[in-house]
Amino acid sequence: GKRLRGILIVFCLLISNLGSSFPQDKSAPGAVQVHLVITAEAQREDSELPALRQDDVKVKQGKTFLQVTQLIPARGDTAALQLFILIDDTLDSHVGNNLNDIREFISAQPPATLIGIGYMSNAGVNIVQNFTPDHALAAKALRLPRGNTSTMDSPYLSLISLVKGWPQQNVRREVLMVTDGIDRLRGEKPTASQLGPSFGPVYHSMPTMSPDVNSASEISQRYNVIVHSVYAIGVGRAARSSWDLQIGLSGLSKLADETGGECFSLGTSNAVSFKPYLERLQKIFESQYFLVFLATPGKKPGLQRVRISTELANVEIAAPDNVWVSAGK
C-alpha cells in the first residue's frame, strides 16, 4: 500500500543508477528486451560452482533459441535485493523456536539487502516492518505467530496482495514464506465445481490444491518476484490431516519451482532448525545473475513460456517458467 511505497522512495534514489548497468542493446527488428533474475545451482552440494558467462546461458522458446544480450552477476553495484519475509499467522507456536534462526539470517544480510516483514492472515498481509536497510530493526519486528485461524486463511492470496502492491524496480525482488501452504479458505473444503460432476450429490471433503496457487505463481512471474518457502505446520484440523499437509507442501513446491525459487522442507514434518535452510538460501542469493535477452512480442503483452539452461557440467539454472513480454509496436 502507501506505506510500502513510501519506505522505498529513498531506496529508489540509492539504486536509480542500477539502470545504467543495463545498457540498451541494438535489438533485432521487432524484438523486445526481457529482464529477469536466474540462479546458478550445483547439481551436487559438494562440488564447486563455476561463474557463468553470457554464452553459457541458453534461452529457448519452443524450438527457437533467443538471443542473450547480457548476463550480470548480482554482486557489487548490482547486488541490490528486496527480500520480504512472510510468516503465516496460523502457524503453531512451536515455530517460535526457529525465530532466532530467522533473526540471525536477517542480521547477517549485506548492506545492499532491504528486509520487509509481514504476517499472513485474512487473505492479506499485516506489514510489521516495511522495507528497511536497518537489519537490526527488521529482526526486532519478528514476533510469534498468533497460532489461530481467521475467516480467510490463504497464503497464496496473501502473497498476491503483497506482490500487487510492490513497486517495480530493476533489483532482485524475492519472498521467503514460512507456512504449511494449506489454503484453509478454498482448498481444504473444495466446492462442487472443483470436485467435478462425477462425485454426484454426496459431498466429499477431499482437499485439492488451492486454485490460487496458479494465480499466485502467474502474478509473481508477471512482476519478476521469486518465491522461496520454508515449510512449517499450522494449527487446526487441517494441520492434523496428512492429505492437507501434503497438498499444502505440493502447492509451495509448485510455486517455488515455477518462479525460480526453492521450497525447503523435511517432508511434512517441522524442522528442528531453519538454519540449514537459511544457509542454503544465502548461497542462492550469492549465485544469482541478471539475465537480459530478446523475445518476440505478441499482439498483446503477456507471459511467454521459455526454458533457460546451461551446458556447463554439474550446473543447473533455476529460473521462472514464464517471462512477461510487452506487446510489439
Language-model regions: role of each:
Residues F22-K329:
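Scaffold/interface architecture of coatomer-like assemblies
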Residues G1-L4:
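N-terminal secretory signal peptides that target proteins for export/translocation
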Residues G6-N17:
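Bacterial N-terminal signal peptides
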